A protein has these predicted regions:
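Extended active-site neighborhood of metal-dependent phosphoesterases/phosphodiesterases
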Residues: 57, 121-151, 204-314, 341-345, ...
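N-terminal active-site segment of His-dependent metallophosphoesterases
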Residues: 53, 60-68, 73-79, 84-102, ...
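C-terminal segment of N-terminal export signals and the immediately downstream linker at the start
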Residues: 26-67
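A short C-terminal boundary segment appended to hydrolase-like catalytic domains
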Residues: 404-432
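Active-site neighborhood of phospho(di)ester-bond hydrolases with catalytic His/Asp-centered motifs
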Residues: 164-166, 190-195, 224-230, 320-323, ...
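N-terminal secretory signal peptides and thylakoid transit peptides that target proteins
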Residues: 1-20
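Short acidic, glycine-rich surface-loop motifs adjacent to enzyme active sites
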Residues: 197, 311-332
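Short, flexible loop/turn segments at beta-strand junctions in immunoglobulin-like
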Residues: 111-116
Length: 432
């Protein structure tokens, strides 16, 4: 993926082409003993080829904010230019502790201060950057993406829709078929419900399978919502996944560590994002003392109670929860996730904590994955919420879930990916 095969460079860069002849040198003018004798020193970054490795990935669109990430081929700095018209005019940078970003593999920026149900425009800007010493550094001229647009979510939209793909396990042909179907259905957002890859040992793996699996701007205008799966926690690079799949901002410091938990309204639908964690208990020898999910799930339970009390969530006509590992399995012998034998078929510890809140606040549907086979469980007298489980990574068992809701009903449909046949369709009436 180093040169992003199939990447339309001319369309992506717009009017700026970067190469040896067009590299601009930016030299610090800082004074002091450290830079004595090198005030005018500068050096071009060694890589003057294309240094953007993916189209922008729009994510985490809320009523008032959105984040954008993009992959790199060389160490760079960058920012997002945005505005209410294609003229843009504002800049967002992922600055931290007074420093603007400098990254090797991914850049990102969060746009804030937005208005609900409003259209915005943006483009990314990337400049390859080189440090030789503290004051001997340089950057190329920015490389710009095309201008894209998105609309913030909010409760005032008359309808809401989402598309779910899951357990892709770095199977790029399957990912491309999912995206092709999503292009036809035009959902408000794509929810990638865990196990995007089988493991994460380096950044290149993420660039190929997540940032640019289709060689197209598949997520530049239609946001990706990421719900972690158990495989998304495996490997030496798993802790860096947030560089590409950005986390949500929590408004309560108590929940700052819950980066992938969030609740938002998309028209009549309230979406609740939960993280079931790994498919074995923390004390399983497979983790070598590297798992600590029990307190993490307990904290999510406290967060979930607060999220479901939020007025815009509590008043939603439909409430849908998303998590990777199912919370229910009809098989009485199914592995519940709290024993040493093999791996969880469903996550009974999470169900014990979260199902009572689903009951109390009227959650109608849980959308899950993990089992690599489609299933649908109707509500029962002991469980008022339904559960749908998506398919697996191979075309033979892959399926897509699509949901559309308006003021009259919410309709859920599951489709086989290989022949586009319908596996089932269900409707839900408004809660309120």
């Amino acid at each position: 993926m180093g040169n992003c095969e199939g990447f339309n460079r001319r369309a992506f860069l717009g009017s700026v082409a970067v190469g040896v002849g067009s590299s601009a040198i930016l030299t610090s003018n800082a004074q002091g003993q450290e830079n004595k004798g090198q005030e005018n020193a500068s050096a071009k970054p060694e890589q003057t080829q294309q240094f953007v490795a993916s189209y922008p990935i729009l994510q985490n669109v809320t009523e008032t904010s959105a984040s954008i990430a993009w992959a790199l081929n060389t160490p760079s700095t960058g920012w997002v230019e945005w505005g209410t018209t294609p003229a843009l005019g504002k800049i967002a940078r992922n600055s931290e502790f007074g420093l603007n970003p400098f990254e090797e593999d991914f850049l990102s920026a969060r746009i804030s201060g937005l208005a609900p149900n409003t259209k915005y425009y943006y483009r990314t800007a990337t400049a390859a950057f080189s440090y030789r010493t503290a004051y001997d550094k340089s950057a190329t001229e920015p490389q710009y993406s095309d201008v894209y647009s998105f609309t913030t979510c909010g409760p005032n939209a008359k309808s809401g829709s989402f598309f779910v793909m899951n357990d892709t396990h770095n199977t790029i042909p399957t990912i491309r078929e999912h995206v092709k179907l999503a292009d036809e259905l035009k959902p408000d957002f794509i929810l990638w419900n865990g196990d995007l890859c089988s493991f994460y040992m380096d950044a290149q793996h993420i660039k190929e399978n997540i940032a640019n699996p289709t060689n197209s701007p598949y997520a530049a205008e239609r946001p990706i919502i990421f719900v972690p799966g158990n495989h998304d926690r495996r490997g030496s690079w798993a802790r860096n996944l947030k560089k590409c799949l950005t986390t949500w901002e929590q408004d309560d410091p108590k929940f700052y560590s819950l980066g992938y938990n969030y609740a938002f309204r998309q028209g009549p639908i309230a979406a609740i994002l939960l993280d079931t964690g790994e498919d074995k208990p923390d004390w399983h020898p497979a983790w070598s003392e590297m798992a600590n999910y029990e307190p993490y799930r307990e904290l999510q339970t406290a967060w979930l109670m607060k999220a479901l009390e939020r007025p815009e969530i509590k008043s939603a006509p439909y409430i849908v929860a998303f998590c990777h590992i199912p919370l229910y399995d009809k098989n009485p012998k199914a592995n519940p996730g709290n024993i040493l034998d093999r791996w969880a078929s469903f996550q009974w510890p999470c169900c014990q904590m979260w199902s009572p809140l689903f009951e109390k606040y009227g959650v109608q549907l849980a959308v899950a994955a993990h089992q690599h086979r489609f299933s649908y469980a109707e509500p029962t007298k002991d469980r008022s919420w339904a559960q749908i489980v998506g398919g697996g990574p191979e075309m033979a068992n892959a399926c897509s879930i699509y949901c559309y809701a308006d003021e009259n009903e919410m309709k859920l449909t599951c489709t086989k990916l290989d022949d586009k046949s319908e596996l089932g369709s269900w409707t839900y009436k408004p809660r309120v």
